[in-house]
Each structure stands twice: as C-alpha cells, then as structure tokens.
From Swiss-Prot:
Location within or outside the cell: Cell outer membrane
InterPro entries per record: LipoPS_assembly_LptD, LptD, LptD_C, OstA-like_N
Family: Belongs to the LptD family.
GO terms, biological process: Gram-negative-bacterium-type cell outer membrane assembly; lipopolysaccharide transport
The protein's role, per its UniProt record: Together with LptE, is involved in the assembly of lipopolysaccharide (LPS) at the surface of the outer membrane.
PTM (free text): Contains two intramolecular disulfide bonds.
Tree of life domain: Bacteria
Signal sequence annotation: 1-24
Cystines in this chain: C31-C724, C173-C725
The encoding gene: lptD
The organism's taxonomic lineage, starting at the top: Bacteria, Pseudomonadati, Pseudomonadota, Gammaproteobacteria, Enterobacterales
The name this protein goes by in its record: LPS-assembly protein LptD
Main localization category: membrane
Keywords linked to the UniProt accession: Cell outer membrane, Disulfide bond, Membrane, Signal
One Pfam family cited in the UniProt record for this chain: LptD_N
Species, as recorded: Salmonella typhi
Length: 784
C-alpha cells in the first residue's frame, strides 16, 4: 500500500508568525530548550511516491473495502509519522471516478509528528486522495520553533494550502506558561497568500480576555499583507496619555501605506498619521501626511487663530531613470512653528530651526551634468524672521580630465533669490567657475596644483528699504571676478614598529597647502546664502571660509598639518592623531562689516584644529576633536567621547561637547545666535549606558548636563524585561522642548512610555537598547 499520510500543520498562527531572522543568541537558545526538535533523518523532495510503512499489534481487513489496525499502530511515510491505538482505513469506489476514495480514521491517543509540528488528540480523520484532514480537540506544538496551542477542530484543505481552526488558540510561551494567547472562533490561514483571517479574535493575558475584535486580518510570513501592527502607548506632559494603533495596507507590489490613528488625551482628538511608500521607474519615495483636525491646547494658547488644523507633510524621493535622469525631493512643511515642540515626529524635532522644501531634476552623462532645483525654507521662529528661497537654481558641471597632464572643469550656476518679506532685497546671481589642475601622485605622495577663475554677476532689486536703513548701500548691478591659485602637497612615510609592537606599522603624513585669493569688496552684495563653515582638521584644507557664493574671503595663507596613524598586523587602524593650522600672511576679508573679526586686522597663525581616534582595545575607543580660532579669541568647538562596548547591549559612553557663544553667533542665523539660550554657548557633559542588570532584565540611560546653565539638558531612562513569550519596556525621558522668551528659561517635556512586545509576533529577540539610545534627542553615536 503506497499512500501518503498528509502533513498536519497545527495552526496558521504558529507557522506564520515565526521567523528565523534576527534572534539574539543567548535568549533564543534558552527559549529553544522547551521546544522539541526533529531527530529523524530528514527526507527532502516529494514524498508522495514513498512507501507507507504500517506496524501494529493486530490487523484485519475486508479487501478491498477496509482494514483495521489495532494496538500500538505506527504509520510512517517520508517525514510523517502517525501513531494511535486504532486506525481504520476505508476505500470506496465513487461512481464516475477512476480512483477509489481512501480515508483514514485514527482513534485513541492519536499522535502525529513531522519536521514541522507535533499534534496530539483523541481522534483524527484524513482523505488520502484530496489530502483534506480533520483533527478533533488537538494540542499542537511546533517543531524547532516556538508556538503551540489547542483547537476543538483543525481542518486542512486545498492540498494543505488552507488551515482552518475552530475555537483555536496560539501562544509562543513555552510549555507550562500561558502568559498570553490569541483565541478565535474560526481562523483561516492561507499559506499561498500568507494571510490569516480571525473571527471573534480575543487576546488573553493568562485566562483573562483583554481585547476583542469581531474580525482581524493579519499579515503572516515574509509576504507583505495588510493588517494591524502592534499598538503602542506612552504618557507625556505635553500630550498626557497617547495611544497608537498602526494599520499596514499592502496596496500593490510597488506601493504600501501605514495608517496610524494617534490618540492624544490632552489635545482632545486623534491625529491621523499616514505614511505612503512607492517604487516607480522614476525612483523610490516616501510621503507622510499627519493631520490633527483640531487642537484644544493650541486653541487656548492662540485664541486669535481659532480652531486650527495642525498638520505635517513630508516627501522624500530619490531616483534615476534611463540612467541619465535624476529626480530628488526633500520636502518638509508643517502647519505652524510650534508643531515639532508639540508633537514627536521622525521627520523633525524641537531642536530644528527650519524645514526645507527642495525639488531637483538632474541630467548626467559622461563628463557633464546639469541640475534644476528650487529650495525654500520654513523658519520656526515667532519673530517673523525672513528667509530666502532659490526659485529656481541651475547648476552645470563639465569635466574634461586627462587633457595631457591636466584635468579641467567648468562649473556654472544661475539662481534667483526671493525673500519671504516684501521689503527685503532680491537678486538674480550668475556664476561661472572654470578650473584647471595638474595632479601628480605616486604611492608615497601627491601634489595637486590648481588655478580657477570665479566670475559672478548680481542683479539686485527691491533695495529701497534696506539702503534707507543701513549705512552700507547695496548696488543694483555688481560684477565680481576673483582668481584663485592653490598648491596642495602630501607625503606618506611608513615605518615598521617591530621594536615596540611586532607586526604594527606607523605612518607619518605631513601636508602643506598654499591658497591665494585676491581681495574683492563685497559690501555691495547682500548675503543670500553664505555662512561660516564649521572646521575640523580636514576643514582646514578647504578653499572657502564660507559656504555659498555671496561671501568669498580673500586668502594669502599656508595651511600645514600632520597626521600619524598606527595599524596592527591585520591592517586595522588602531590610532591616529591630526594637528593643523592656518597661517595668514594677510587678513582674510570680504568687505562685510557685519562679520566681526574682519575689523580686527589679524594675521599670523589664527586657526588651529586637531582630531584623534584611539581604538584602545576591542572594547575601548576614544574620539576627540578641538578647534581654536584666535579671531574668536577662544576655543571655537571641542568634543570628546570615550566608550566601552562589550557587545550591542553592553556599553558605556562618556561625552563632552562645547561650542563658544562667538562661534554660535558666527555660524547660526542671527535669530538663533542672538537668542537667550545661546548667549553663553554650549558646554555639556554627559553619559549614555546600556547594560543587562539581571537575568532577562536590562537598563538603558542617557544624561547630559549643561554646565553653563547648571541644569540637565537631556535625561532618558529605560527598563526592559525580555522573555521567551513577551517583552515589557518602560521608558522615561526629559528633554529640552523650546524656550520661554517671557520667563527666560528652557521648556522641558517629560515622557513616560510603555510597550509590550509579544514574542512569536516579532522575530527580534534583542533587548532593544540600541533603538532606545538612538531615538534620544541627543542620539547615541558609536566611538568605536
């Protein structure tokens, strides 16, 4: 008798809500201790044609209609095994059918197992022709994975495509623990579509039902399916109780959406958070529209505005079409300047000063590219501060390298600047910048000689109000032509450190750059897009002091620097330190009296910068950097970070960050640099830590203290319990959320979050500490 005993899979939930990916090794191995494994040789491929072996104490039959096997019945085919006290085999010839219908009844202590499931029950039935199967009052346990439960009746239909449960349950908790379970009056699992439908779904904690839904459709397996995701809740001082219930919508293979009703008790309404993702021939993108119909807190604080709708729109797109066209969108806009102070969003924060709305279309072929873009800014400032937008901007590059020993490039730009205020200057700027360079290099050094010409034309309009209120007058039409000459040389010396550390290698890399740019008075040009560039060691060797084109500082300077690196015997960099300085032969000027240090007439060694990295061991790392600017009469910026990392869940990091008030005034827009909260600069010390404190318990925390204000700048503490069938996470965060100009003090928001994660519904067994650290307002960054 060669017939296949069909595979009996226990339940849709157990087979579908488990994944092998992303398991944390320690906990995963512990959780497998209570899970049975398949210990027979695994048979691969189609087992339909394999023989069926039946062993029993007794057998009798009425050939060809039926046969009865009793006493320790053991039936095997391929990976499947069926054991019972009694098995009845029936065969009946149906009218008009070439093959007889063969069915099996199993009675008493029914035990079925294969490489996927173990099932036990008092009674079972199977149709050997159609593979339809029924099992009554069965207990099931998944093999090699978490998942078990019960069902009054389990049915398999459609060549094992569908598993149907009547009064079925599922839990991923190990045997002996029923901390949580999901129960449904009927459950249909479609393996081909990887979707589960549950009627009268009840979620239980222990024996107590705490959630009910008349119908649920859950995505299962790796195939994207529509359905509800795990809800989340937290409590904050700005919104009180908050609850999230995300729903995932699989619209098409190339697009999907997540719709999240977000209830905020203090706001008295539900914010609808709608995320849409897509993939087209023109690229991939993401759109987010968050909408709050009304906000009673905002209405109380801004009574003149009435019932205000609050919203956020975000659009990010990046794509290439036909290998030559580039499309990019980076667009963020909100209903009001207080939006990110009142609502948490991954598309902005309370520390952001503005939102950007940028669109660009580019065309690129060999040696040539062109981009047309528009850029606008939404400034989050209640002082009605103006801002400039580029509407539109054209950037063109043409390269012709290996022209003999030379490389050449021509860069061109045309842009029209528009201000948000009617009385501010506006301009059209056209810039042309041809460059020729002579690059020379070998394995121990390089020398690059470069010359360029920077020609810029400004046509400025709407100057009446500005010229009437300022001593320096702007000009309607300005032409500025500035040549630039640069020589940049670098050497690399290498030595074996066999005497000190066998197998280690040290390099010494001196670098010298001379830069010359003649002075041109730019006081007749308004500053539309230039700001002081932040400098580290590599920044010392930049051509420009300012970003943008409105301020190009004169230069007659030599930049010198040296870097040393140490590599171990595996060519891993263990240590480096870089120190450099800029020596000015003449004062660097633009003619703009608004730039403070241009009135100091300083020359000599003015700017110093240093960076260092030390990988002390496999677990210890140190990074540090400092910039000193004599034009600011102070250390401009500095930062240090010392980290001990045992693994991704065990780390301690100490941090220090400093920015002088003079540096802030020089780099930030005036409406921020002059604000009260920045008058003393930034001087903060802090620490972040993550560590398991007991079996399955872990803690994560961050604390930053501002020594200028003698107040905490940011605090975060999280505690998590992790087990085989659930995880509980509780978090507290106190973060800076704005500035009260009337009372002249910082505004803080306190948040308490609570999250439960059901194991078996997620493939992640990790402690979640990295996510908690990186979600902080001062996010963790590794020093290793």
């Amino acid at each position: 008798m060669k017939k296949r005993i069909p595979t009996l899979l226990a339940t849709m939930i157990a087979s579908a809500l488990y994944s092998h990916q992303g398991l944390a090794a320690d906990l995963a191995s512990q959780c497998m201790l209570g899970v049975p494994s398949y210990d027979r040789p695994l048979v691969k491929g189609d087992t339909n044609d394999l023989p069926v072996t039946i062993n029993a104490d007794n057998a009798k039959g009425n050939y060809p209609d039926d046969a009865v096997f009793t006493g320790n019945v053991d039936i095997m085919q391929g990976n499947s095994r069926l054991q019972a006290d009694e098995v009845q085999l029936h065969q009946k010839q149906a009218e008009g059918q070439p093959e007889p219908v063969r069915t099996v009844d199993a009675l008493g202590n029914v035990h079925y197992d294969d490489n996927q499931v173990i099932l036990k029950g008092p009674k079972g039935w199977a149709n050997l022709n159609t593979k339809d199967t029924n099992v009554w009052e069965g207990d099931y346990q998944m093999v090699g994975r978490q998942g078990r439960g019960k069902a009054d009746l389990m049915k398999q239909r459609g060549e094992n495509r569908y598993t149907i449960l009547e009064n079925g349950s599922f839990t991923s908790c190990l045997p002996g623990s029923d901390t949580w379970s999901v129960v449904g009056s009927e459950v249909i699992h479609d393996r081909e579509e990887q979707v589960a439908e549950i009627w009268n779904a009840r979620f239980k904690v222990g024996p107590v039902p705490i959630f009910y839904s008349p119908y649920l459709q859950l995505p299962v397996g790796d195939k994207r399916r529509s359905g509800f995701l795990i809800p989340n809740a937290k409590y904050t001082t700005k919104n009180y109780f908050e609850f999230y219930l995300p729903y995932y919508w699989n619209i098409a293979p190339n697009m999907d959406a997540t719709i999240t009703p977000h209830y905020m008790h203090r706001r008295g309404n539900i914010m609808w958070e709608n995320e849409f993702r897509y993939l087209t021939q023109a690229g991939a993108g993401l759109m987010e529209l968050d909408y709050l119909p009304s906000d009673k807190v905002y209405e109380d604080e801004h009574p003149k505005e009435g019932d205000k709708h609050r919203w956020l729109f975000y659009w990010q797109h990046s794509g290439v079409m036909d290998q030559v066209w580039r499309f990019n969108v980076d667009y963020t806009k909100v209903s009001d300047s207080s939006y990110f102070n009142d609502f948490d969003s991954k598309y902005g924060s309370s520390t952001d000063g503005y939102a950007t709305q940028k669109f660009s279309v580019g065309y690129a072929v060999q040696n040539f590219d062109a981009t047309v873009s528009t850029k606008q800014f939404q400034v989050f400032n209640d002082q009605n501060t103006s801002s400039y937008s580029a509407e539109p901007q054209l950037d063109v590059n043409y390269y012709h390298n290996d022209l003999g020993p030379f490389d050449t490039r021509i860069y061109g730009q045309a842009v029209h600047f528009v201000n948000t205020k009617d009385n501010m200057p506006e301009a059209t700027r056209v810039h042309l910048e041809p460059t020729i360079s002579l690059p020379l290099s070998n394995r121990w050094g390089s020398l690059n000689t470069e010359a360029k010409l920077m020609a810029t034309h400004y046509q400025q309009t709407n100057l009446d109000w500005y010229n009437a209120n300022n001593s320096k007058k702007l000009e309607d039409s300005v032409n500025r032509v500035m040549p630039q000459f640069k020589v940049d040389g670098k050497l690399v010396f290498e030595r074996d450190m066999a005497m000190l550390a066998p197998g280690y290698t040290q390099t010494l890399e001196p670098r010298v750059q001379y830069l010359y740019v003649p002075y041109r008075d730019q006081s007749g040009i308004y500053n539309y897009d230039s700001s002081l560039l932040q400098s580290d060691y590599n920044g010392l060797f930049r051509d420009r002091t300012y970003g943008g084109l409105d301020r190009i500082a004169s230069a007659n300077q030599v930049t010198t620097g040296v870097t040393t690196r140490i590599y171990d015997d595996a060519a891993v960099e263990r240590f480096n330190v870089s120190v450099g300085q800029i020596y000015y032969f003449t004062e660097s000027r633009t003619g703009d009296d608004n730039i403070k240090w241009e009135n100091d007439d300083k020359t000599g060694s003015l700017v110093w910068a240093g960076d260092t990295y030390w990988r002390i061991s496999e677990r210890w790392g140190l990074r540090s950097g400092v910039q000193y600017d004599t034009r600011l009469d102070s250390v401009a910026t500095s930062s240090s970070s010392l980290e001990y990392r045992r693994d991704q869940d065990r780390l301690v990091q100490l941090n220090y960050r400093y920015a002088s008030p003079e540096y802030i005034q020089a780099t930030l827009p005036s409406y921020y640099s002059t604000a009260e909260q920045y008058k003393n600069g930034i001087n903060q010390v802090g620490a972040v830590a993550s560590w398991p404190i007991a079996d399955r318990w872990s803690i994560v925390g961050a604390y930053y203290f501002d020594t200028n204000s003698s107040k905490p700048a940011d605090q975060m503490l999280g505690l998590q319990y992790n087990s085989c069938c659930y995880a509980i996470r509780v978090g507290y965060e106190r973060k800076l959320n704005g500035w009260d100009n009337d009372k002249q003090h910082a505004i803080y928001d306190n948040a308490i979050g609570f999250n439960i994660e059901l194991r078996g519904l997620s493939s992640n067994y990790g402690l979640g500490t990295q996510e908690m650290l990186r979600s902080n307002i001062l996010p963790y960054q590794s020093s290793m």
